[in-house]
Amino acid sequence: MHHQWLLLAACFWVIFMFMVASKFITLTFKDPDGYGAKQEPLILTAVTKVEEARVPEEKHWTKEFQPTGKAFTGNLLHHPLVHMERLELLRNVCRDTALRNLSHTAVSKFVLDRIFVCDKHKILFCQTPKVGNTQWKKVLIVLNGAYSSIDEIPESIVHDHEKNGLPRLSSFSDSEIKKRLNLYFKFFIVRDPFERLISAFKDKFVHNPRFEPWYRHEIAPSIIRKYRRNRMETKGLQFEDFVRYLGDPNHRWLDVQFGDHIIHWVTYVELCAPCEITYSVIGHHETLEDDAPYILKAAGIDRLVSYPTIPPGITVYNKTKVERYFSGISKRDIRRLYARFEGDFKLFGYRVPDFLLN
């Protein structure tokens, strides 16, 4: 009898240790940065499937470069799971009542003007400047049949919306708009919100490669008059002035004065209404090398056109550059800027820039 009790106790101990080990393994493979309270060990399954597919090239991204903050390695960035996760995050943030004022907007003419239509292949593309939109416009121009290849399209035509053959969604009747929004493949591209603002500032107020004089001669002086603290400073628009303008809760009156030129720095929410329009895919500038082929395939056009070659390193998030531009700007002004763009950070999974805010 004594031996039977010892055997029973030993069996119980083995079972108990097995249960503890199983629980530990499950916890180990849970995603530590998951957005919801309930976590599932999904990553292990996904990794196994991708390895079986033998993706030819693996790129390793640090956490800083992961747009959604999840623990995906480079060889998973083109995987459908990533894009499902982005859309799930978007839906969850859209439902957050605390962020409603930062995540929702009416589907106005301003929004419909941003969306370009390719009826031939049933595609809608929402323009978000400073994230490589010129190349996507070229893709759609070719698909619409205006040119046979991207290389043939003159740069002047791409931005001439009267001649490039890309109608805006706003040009259709209400019933036609509704039909296209319900049935067409819809996408847009985002990037780190603060890095996008730096790009807009450089492109419009520093280099101005398209020779658009109104940015320097009309918009810049208006911002300087209202937001420059040192009235003795005679330089052109500085990034600090730009940040104060964008972070001012009363910026709307200047936005109205500037008209459609504000598309280069207003929020993604204001441009594309992502909580009101159900988009099929949201690409990220930081992972565009993987996202562009995925979008083409998801839209069913990957055999008809290719996304132009991306120069090495051009889409990589540059923390050093961001720190350099924001150095010398008060924490108060940076926090006010973040308060305006918080919806963009949360909706698309970009990390809070604590290195600037604190």
UniProtKB/Swiss-Prot annotation:
- Which EC class is this protein assigned? transferase
One Gene Ontology cellular component: Golgi membrane
Q: Does the keyword Iron apply?
A: no
**Residues that carry a glycan:** 101, 318
Tell me which EC number(s) this protein carries.
2.8.2.-
Q: Which organism is it from?
A: Gallus gallus
Q: How does it sit in the membrane?
A: Single-pass type II membrane protein
The source's domain of life comes to Eukaryota
Q: Name one GO molecular function term.
A: sulfotransferase activity
Where is it expressed, tissue-wise? Predominantly expressed in hypertrophic, prehypertrophic and proliferative chondrocytes at E12 but is down-regulated in epiphyseal chondrocytes.
Name the residues that span the membrane: 7-27
One of this protein's GO BP terms?
carbohydrate biosynthetic process
Give the InterPro entries listed for this entry. Answer: Carb_sulfotrans_8-10 (IPR018011), P-loop_NTPase (IPR027417), Sulfotransferase (IPR005331)
Record function comment: Catalyzes the transfer of sulfate to position 3 of terminal glucuronic acid of both protein- and lipid-linked oligosaccharides. Participates in biosynthesis of HNK-1 carbohydrate structure, a sulfated glucuronyl-lactosaminyl residue carried by many neural recognition molecules, which is involved in cell interactions during ontogenetic development and in synaptic plasticity in the adult.
Query: What's the protein here called?
Result: Carbohydrate sulfotransferase 10
* Broad class of the protein's primary localization: Golgi
* Family under the similarity heading: Belongs to the sulfotransferase 2 family.
SUPFAM superfamilies hit by this protein: P-loop containing nucleoside triphosphate hydrolases
